[in-house]
């Protein structure tokens, strides 16, 4: 029994369970639009990681919704593989009403781990900060240039 646990732990350390971008795209839900490209997803994950270090993120549907209603600004990043979609389908509309840039990334597991959490996360808001201003501005520019859903 302990041997099996060691094998699983070894796989996680070497990255044996990582999926490619194409495999992750196959699991996205129908409302995941605009979906970030592989390159933009990587930039967003890095920006989330930098923001988490200085505690400038909002994590989870309830918290993000609360701060959108309060008028806080930032980039909203959604996980495209969240099911059921009823959990967060109202948030993109709230972002559009308040003209906040938002994008979908293919994996909630990757989004959660980039925020420094062991749990998957379906939505994160990245707030602007001076320490990662360059990366943040680059992400805002690319996210706003994505085609908006109709």
Curated annotation (Swiss-Prot):
Stored SUPFAM superfamilies: L30e-like (SSF55315)
Cytoplasm listed as a keyword: no
GO cellular component: box H/ACA snoRNP complex; sno(s)RNA-containing ribonucleoprotein complex; telomerase holoenzyme complex
Keywords, comma-separated and alphabetical: Nucleus, Ribonucleoprotein, Ribosome biogenesis, RNA-binding, rRNA processing
Keyword field contains Ribonucleoprotein: yes
Subcellular location per the Swiss-Prot or TrEMBL entry: Nucleus, Nucleolus
GO BP term, example: snRNA pseudouridine synthesis
Source domain of life: Eukaryota
Molecular function terms, GO-annotated: box H/ACA snoRNA binding
Pfam families: Ribosomal_L7Ae
Family affiliation: Belongs to the eukaryotic ribosomal protein eL8 family.
Role according to the record: Required for ribosome biogenesis. Part of a complex which catalyzes pseudouridylation of rRNA. This involves the isomerization of uridine such that the ribose is subsequently attached to C5, instead of the normal N1. Pseudouridine ('psi') residues may serve to stabilize the conformation of rRNAs.
Oligomer and partners: Component of the small nucleolar ribonucleoprotein particle containing H/ACA-type snoRNAs (H/ACA snoRNPs). Component of the telomerase holoenzyme complex.
Protein name per the record: H/ACA ribonucleoprotein complex subunit 2-like protein
Provenance organism: Danio rerio (Zebrafish)
Higher taxonomy: Eukaryota, Metazoa, Chordata, Craniata, Vertebrata
């Amino acid at each position: 029994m302990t041997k099996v646990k060691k094998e699983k732990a070894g796989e996680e350390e070497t990255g044996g369970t990582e999926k490619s971008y194409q495999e992750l795209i196959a699991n996205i839900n129908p409302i995941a639009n605009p979906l970030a490209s592989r390159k933009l997803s990587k930039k967003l994950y890095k920006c989330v990681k930098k923001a988490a270090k200085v505690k400038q993120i909002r994590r989870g549907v309830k918290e993000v919704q609360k701060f959108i209603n309060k008028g806080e600004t930032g980039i909203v990043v959604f996980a495209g593989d969240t099911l059921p979609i009823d959990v967060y389908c109202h948030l993109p509309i709230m972002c559009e009403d308040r003209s906040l840039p938002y994008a979908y990334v293919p994996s909630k597991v990757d989004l959660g781990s980039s925020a420094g959490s062991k749990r998957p996360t379906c939505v994160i808001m990245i707030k602007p900060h001076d320490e990662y201003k360059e990366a943040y501005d680059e992400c805002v520019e690319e996210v706003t240039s994505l085609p908006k859903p109709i």
